[in-house]
């Protein structure tokens, strides 16, 4: 069982460096960063991970751009894997995005994870001039573009949104045959996307039981796509808060679905349960405010949970 952590994307260079260096020293598999370009004043009712769709963040909360942050994180570390959880694929030109990931993979020594999703915040799409209704087909085509650019000597793809031919795309990623693609989402469409394009189903804000209930469909769709289900790993990302950790106050953020808010022993039991269900990787973000408190929770996680995960293999 592998465990990664999600970093707050706050404009605190020293804090980000300390978080990444500490995560690497503690033995976590990965540090991941989320993706938003803008957030709407007044919140939204579209958030897919709360019963009412409510998602309220401070309107002036600063979020660093994801690819820029991953480059900084790569320079702060030497071994830990780095990735997006998840990058909203329709927001950026796919050829440029593929180039950025390939460049970071080369510069980091082959440590990148390409976590992708379709997005959910319609206002953000409107501001960026991207058609919200097309986000699914765009994501599928962009993933096909990534695969062509990363694996073909002379990439070719004739799609609805982009036509690619007569070019070289260099350098290729260090990782072969390509940078691992972690497909986010919790719908049947996301599972079919994983089956066709992904190396990992990286669902978020769900329960372990939800994951287990959907694994038969994922395996079925993977076989229909002509691929071996054993080649696709399963990752679950959730918010984590230890209720018995001294000096750790739960933050003010939205309690999204699947949050793990419990004692240390209950978290240990949950890791065992996830392993029994066939989940290969867990990514946690922390329900505390600020990078300093996040580091404290991460250290508690490393002390009490990482050894359990390592014994599970």
Predicted features along the sequence, with ranges:
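Active-site-adjacent structural elements that line small-molecule/cofactor binding pockets in enzymes
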Residues: 1-313
């Amino acid at each position: 069982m592998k465990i990664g952590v999600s970093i707050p994307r706050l404009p605190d260079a020293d804090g980000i460096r300390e978080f990444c260096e500490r995560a690497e020293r503690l033995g976590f598999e990965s540090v991941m960063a989320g993706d938003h370009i803008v957030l709407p004043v007044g919140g939204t009712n579209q958030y897919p991970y709360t019963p009412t769709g409510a998602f309220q963040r401070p309107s002036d909360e600063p979020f660093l751009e994801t690819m820029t942050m991953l480059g900084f994180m790569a320079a702060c570390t030497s071994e830990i894997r780095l990735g997006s959880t998840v990058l909203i694929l329709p927001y950026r030109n796919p050829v440029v995005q593929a180039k950025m990931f390939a460049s970071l993979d080369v510069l980091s020594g082959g440590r990148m994870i390409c976590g992708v999703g379709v997005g959910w915040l319609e206002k953000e799409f409107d501001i960026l001039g991207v058609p919200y209704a097309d986000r699914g087909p765009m994501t599928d085509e962009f993933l096909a573009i990534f695969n062509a650019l990363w694996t073909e000597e002379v990439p070719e793809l004739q799609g609805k949104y982009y036509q690619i031919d007569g070019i070289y795309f260099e350098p290729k990623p260090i990782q072969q045959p390509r940078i691992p693609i972690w497909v986010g989402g919790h719908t049947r469409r996301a599972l079919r996307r994983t089956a066709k394009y992904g190396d990992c189903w990286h669902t978020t804000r769900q329960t372990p039981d939800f994951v287990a209930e959907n694994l038969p469909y994922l395996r079925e769709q993977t076989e229909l796509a002509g691929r071996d289900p054993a080649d696709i790993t399963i990752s679950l990302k959730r918010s984590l808060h230890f209720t018995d950790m001294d000096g750790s106050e739960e933050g003010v953020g939205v309690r999204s679905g699947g949050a793990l808010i419990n004692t240390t022993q209950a978290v240990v039991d949950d890791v065992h349960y996830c392993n029994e269900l066939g989940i290969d990787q867990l990514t946690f973000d922390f329900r505390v405010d600020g990078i300093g408190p996040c580091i404290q929770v991460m250290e508690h996680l490393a002390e009490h949970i990482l050894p359990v995960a390592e014994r599970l293999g």
